Amino acid sequence: MIQALRGMNDMMDDEAKLYKKIIDVCEDTAKKYGYEYIEIPKLEETALFKRSVGESSDIVGKEMYQFTDKSGNDVCLRPEGTAGVVRAFIEHKMDRAGGVKKYFYHGSMFRYERPQKGRLREFHQFGIECFSEGSVYEDASVILMLSEILKKLDIEATLKINSLGDGDCMPKYREKLLKFLKENENELCSDCKRRISTNPIRVLDCKVEHCQKILQNAPLITENLNEICAGEFSKLQEILTANGVTFEVDPKLVRGLDYYTKTAFEFVSGEIGSQSAVGGGGRYDNLVAFLGGRPTFGVGFALGIERFMEILSSKESKQKRVGIYICALDKKYIDKIFKIGIDLRRNFKVEISYEAKNLQKHLKNADNKNAEIFLCMGENEAKNDELFMKNLIAKTNKNIKIAEILKEIR
């Protein structure tokens, strides 16, 4: 049987509805901020991403779906959306049209990574790009938009911000960082050693624990900003605070793409286990000119739809849990749990199991039936006129007296 490729999933039924719900919220919010829809190809020249994302980046170096087509063109499936929007902006001469242009997009992106929870080879993003607006107020507006989307979808996340400086302060900082890294090179991981010669700023993004300890003593970009960049970063914090947005300044936040300048930001959430980025972006004032257009300010963000779906589906499954599942570990106790179950049905939705199974099988059945409360009688419980009770939402459990069931469940 032919199946979907590894890391590329079908989206059906509830998943498809959830995807549409997220997109609808994102689109509605973007339109209220003055953004218009843009559709760009999923297949582009490889050179576009080598120049924009950076040849030394992991995306270009390891993760692109790159191939030569039948005409001999070096092409790849897009690994991210910003570069394609910038290419379209230049190709259609929007860089010469004057005025601020704002676009939003959504769709598939492709990276050849090891598939794991929250990370697929074909994944989906919603993104926005604003051109020709250099004010730090627009940086704040972009952050506020993503914050608003998160609130509308009831996703809890922490905002982290940083400034990467400009063409004046970044080279000076890069020199200081390079000196520090070379002094500690022998203690760094192999990826960090490679990045020292290709892109030393990306070393700050390393997640290896012993590298993080070494980097605690690294020079910070926020302490090496020139007067203009420092002033804008301070103003950004002032605007966010005035608009009720809490944040953390993270001087080691560099994002995974080479084109960012000045503002960089990321929203991270602990709702899917360890702290994971659910969306982020920043300013890229040099990218349009770097790709052949006229010098044009740029700022934007992208968010991971699958990450949002994982959080929301987990919440919805908890919200759907209702009622009681009652069972026995031995058939000689089924008469007892049957009577208890019938009594409970006067006040609750109750599923009674007539089969004697082991505890894990019963728990699996209760989970499949989306029960909120699991009740079970085994030998010890029967002797003590008790039931084992587990709350399948709170993940707590204890033994309760049969006479006190109603008090415990309410």
Swiss-Prot record:
The keyword Ribonucleoprotein does not apply. Pfam families: HGTP_anticodon, tRNA-synt_His. One of its GO terms (biological process) is histidyl-tRNA aminoacylation. It is found in: Cytoplasm. It catalyses: tRNA(His) + L-histidine + ATP = L-histidyl-tRNA(His) + AMP + diphosphate + H(+). HAMAP family: His_tRNA_synth. This is Histidine--tRNA ligase. The gene is hisS.
